[in-house]
């Protein structure tokens, strides 16, 4: 699996950089690809666990939205408009298939390496840093919804307040429940050591 992760990263990273630019790597889902690849390569239960906390629910939601967009012609959530935009070549849009693979890959990684409970805290720290960095990207891109939320399309106060509220939304409503489920259903890394 290490070599598959390495090969995917070697293909995906330069093509994404060329097509979308460096700012695209501020997206939490792209950060997840990078950290998951490193986690698989280094056999790090901490990195895999943090990305299981951070990416599992988001990628499942992405898959539901992509399916709705492609099959039914309407979106469930904002952010996947590029999927049906013919301006971008189909092959580059198809590289986003990682969203479909990531949930299973992360669960496999947690099963194999164990769920490191520190992954929750690490993912909370990663997300805060990423949300802050996203504020320095183009407001029109609204990367990680750092400028306006995806539901009401508004900013929740000045930049620091909006970033904090966006981060708290993810920490409390996405990461914490995922952490509790992973903690409940998977052994710790010490129990999986051979």
Predicted features by range, described:
Residues 32-41, 94-110, 166-181:
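Hydrophobic cores of alpha-helical transmembrane segments in multi-pass inner/ER membrane proteins
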Residues 28, 33-79:
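Hydrophobic/aromatic-rich structural module bridging two neighboring secondary-structure elements via a short loop
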Residues 13-22:
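Short, hydrophobic transmembrane alpha-helix segments
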Residues 61-126:
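Membrane-proximal helix-loop-helix units in multi-pass membrane proteins
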Residues 50-58, 119-130:
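Central hydrophobic cores of alpha-helical transmembrane segments
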Residues 1-12:
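Alpha-helical transmembrane segments
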Residues 137-175:
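Membrane-interface transmembrane-helix boundary segments in multi-pass integral membrane proteins
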């Amino acid at each position: 699996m290490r070599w598959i992760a390495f090969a995917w990263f070697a293909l995906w990273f330069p093509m994404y950089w060329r097509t979308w630019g460096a700012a695209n790597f501020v997206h939490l889902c792209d950060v997840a690809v990078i950290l998951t690849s490193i986690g698989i390569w280094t056999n790090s239960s901490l990195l895999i666990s943090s990305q299981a906390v951070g990416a599992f629910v988001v990628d499942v939601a992405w898959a539901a939205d992509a399916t709705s967009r492609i099959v039914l012609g309407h979106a469930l959530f904002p952010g996947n408009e590029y999927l049906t935009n013919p301006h971008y070549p189909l092959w580059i849009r198809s590289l986003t298939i990682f969203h479909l693979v990531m949930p299973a890959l992360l669960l496999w990684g947690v099963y194999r390496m164990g769920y490191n409970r520190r992954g929750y805290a690490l993912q909370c720290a990663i997300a805060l840093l990423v949300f802050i960095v996203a504020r320095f990207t183009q407001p029109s891109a609204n990367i990680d919804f750092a400028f306006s939320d995806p539901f009401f399309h508004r900013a929740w106060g000045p930049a620091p307040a909006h970033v904090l509220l966006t981060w708290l939304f993810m920490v409390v409503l996405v990461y914490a429940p995922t952490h509790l489920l992973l903690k409940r259903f998977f052994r710790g890394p010490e129990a999986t050591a051979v």
